[in-house]
Amino acid sequence: MPEQLKQRVETCYQQAEAFFKRRFPRPEVSFKLRGQKAGVAHLHENLLRFNLQLYRENQEDFLRQTVAHEVAHLVAHQLFGDRIQAHGEEWQLIMRGVYELPPNRCHNYDVQRRAVTRYIYRCPCPQSDFPFTAQRHKLVHQGRRYLCKRCREILVYSGETRVE
């Protein structure tokens, strides 16, 4: 699957070279991106990072729009330097003129949030559930104490967890 994506990066560069009549150095392409971002262009490293999960779930639009979006960032940087805005007129020119695509800043892919376990802490106050993250729960085990803002008592782990 990543081969199609790499081929689209190459196609975008060939389009930019034909349009601007000059060569551009090819970037390193990485698939080590997670979370809500579909892609990221690292301008000074000449690196493109893509989210494989979002690519798999939105392949057609990803290849057409997202890859061109990120390549346009690198091309704009190589043409116009550091002093341009990320989604400014230079980048928009490349999106419209070179790739004939709308210069959309953000994708609208459905991003699934991963399930997160919360550790329930309580104090003597009525209805006093305090859901702690795994990181905060670990800090309590290492000796950190948290107080209720109302009664100023130390929050105590209830033994319960819930998945959000």
UniProtKB/Swiss-Prot annotation:
<dbReference type="InterPro" id="IPR023483">
    <property type="entry name" value="Uncharacterised_SprT"/>
</dbReference>
<dbReference type="GO" id="GO:0005737">
    <property type="term" value="C:cytoplasm"/>
</dbReference>
<keyword id="KW-0862">Zinc</keyword>
<feature type="binding site">
    <location>
        <position position="69"/>
    </location>
    <ligand>
        <name>Zn(2+)</name>
    </ligand>
</feature>
<comment type="similarity">
    <text>Belongs to the SprT family.</text>
</comment>
<keyword id="KW-0479">Metal-binding</keyword>
<feature type="active site">
    <location>
        <position position="70"/>
    </location>
</feature>
<dbReference type="GO" id="GO:0006950">
    <property type="term" value="P:response to stress"/>
</dbReference>
<dbReference type="GO" id="GO:0008270">
    <property type="term" value="F:zinc ion binding"/>
</dbReference>
<keyword id="KW-0963">Cytoplasm</keyword>
<dbReference type="Pfam" id="PF10263">
    <property type="entry name" value="SprT-like"/>
</dbReference>
<protein>
    <recommendedName>
        <fullName>Protein SprT</fullName>
    </recommendedName>
</protein>
<feature type="domain" description="SprT-like">
    <location>
        <begin position="13"/>
        <end position="156"/>
    </location>
</feature>
<dbReference type="InterPro" id="IPR006640">
    <property type="entry name" value="SprT-like_domain"/>
</dbReference>
<feature type="binding site">
    <location>
        <position position="73"/>
    </location>
    <ligand>
        <name>Zn(2+)</name>
    </ligand>
</feature>
